[in-house]
Amino acid sequence: MKPLTKNNLVAIVGKPNVGKSTLFNRLVGKRVSIVYDQPGVTRDRIYENINWSGKNFRIIDTGGIVVSDQPFVEQIRIQAQIAIEESEIILFVIDGSEEITSDDLYIASILRNSKKKVLVLANKLDNNKNEDYSIYSLGFEDYYKISSVHGEGIGEVLDKVINLMNFENDQDEDLFKIAILGKPNAGKSSLLNALTKQERSIVSEIAGTTRDSIKSTIEIEDQKFFIIDTAGINRKSKLVESVDHYALMRAMGSLDESDLSIIIIDATEELSHFNARIIGYASDKKKPTIIVINKWDLIKKETNTMIEYEKKLREKMPFISWMPIVFISALKSQRLNKLEKVIIQVKNNLSREIKQNLLNDLLVDMQTMNPLTFKGKKLEIKHIKKTNDPVPTFLLFVNNPNIVHFSYLRYIENQIRDYFDFTGCPINLVLKKNK
């Protein structure tokens, strides 16, 4: 068995209709996966966080694996294979009330070849159903009888999971988390090595040489940060036809987990669909974001090259106006000090406190310069207040929330940004009816 990789990921795998999604929903304490008595309902991997006995880890739900050459079944198999590759513990769910099938044996073979730690969960053994003892011939060490519907046996499984994991460096989990994201071979690992000043990732011309998500800590201006270098996919594997799609899904998972995302674009290439999607996802999710243009040393430069590049990028994606753009060469460690300063700037902006009298002045100026009237009704913003949420959030107490158009909210956001530095931070505006 391979040593555990300290990525705190647990995958739920199995054939269709054995109760994987029911188990997943019970573990996370809410309905996330669709539960339906039909094979193939869960098509994509779904990630959620779990806390058990004070320990945090992530769990992945996957679609059912069967022996078939149907296209959608193959996509599910690929999804599950990726989940197996990136996880350190596998929960192999089978229907304990039925005989072992060829699909169960096929999955067992995949799991044995993965060399990962596997816990076999014989589900649906409630209501005094008879157990099929052939499950013990699957070739694994740990077997548990559970009922995902009623929760029986789940606690024992979770106890085993946290006992298998390495939580020695759990204090790092409380640090400010930065995810390094980007298309394979954009320079994610080179940037990680430059920031940590040590070789943590293999740097190669071959895309996808980072096989596991690598987590490191760095210090900038005496502040400690937790860095996640998103895993790639081996280009030589059978998953090659779907590399970009699944790399994107992994990037989205890392972005969800992070406090700040650094999205790397290769300066020598055109803006890819991959980068456009992940930047758009960061914007939609309102995630603090820095865009890094890497390999800038390879670009033939003129006086305004950097300015022109940034201008064109912002024209292509107008929604990134609040995201800073930093030009670097990770391999040659050029302009990394600039990137480090921007990281500190964004972190400070996220926790920026604003005195109420300054917000009151802003409120007066906004309504004086650009009052809003809609169908004869005048908008009156009575009060503005900043909350303590992780992302800068402002409550606007108004006389009539229904007449506020999104364009006026954009005007308010722009005014806030003109008054205060929120570089790299999304801004939430919440309308409240003034009482």
Curated annotation (Swiss-Prot):
Molecular function GO labels: GTP binding; ribosome binding
KH-like domain ranges (all copies): 352-435
Keywords linked to the UniProt accession: GTP-binding, Nucleotide-binding, Repeat, Ribosome biogenesis
Keyword hit for Amino-acid biosynthesis: no
Keyword Nucleotide-binding set for record: yes
SUPFAM superfamilies xref list: P-loop containing nucleoside triphosphate hydrolases
Ranges of residues in domain EngA-type G: 8-169, 176-351
Record InterPro entries: G_ENGA, GTP-bd, GTPase_Der, KH_dom-like, KH_dom-like_a/b, P-loop_NTPase, Small_GTP-bd, VWF_A
Quaternary structure and interacting proteins, as annotated: Associates with the 50S ribosomal subunit.
Family in the record: Belongs to the TRAFAC class TrmE-Era-EngA-EngB-Septin-like GTPase superfamily. EngA (Der) GTPase family.
Protein name: GTPase Der
Organism: Mycoplasmopsis pulmonis (strain UAB CTIP) (Mycoplasma pulmonis)
Lineage: Bacteria, Bacillati, Mycoplasmatota, Mycoplasmoidales, Metamycoplasmataceae
Gene it is expressed from: der
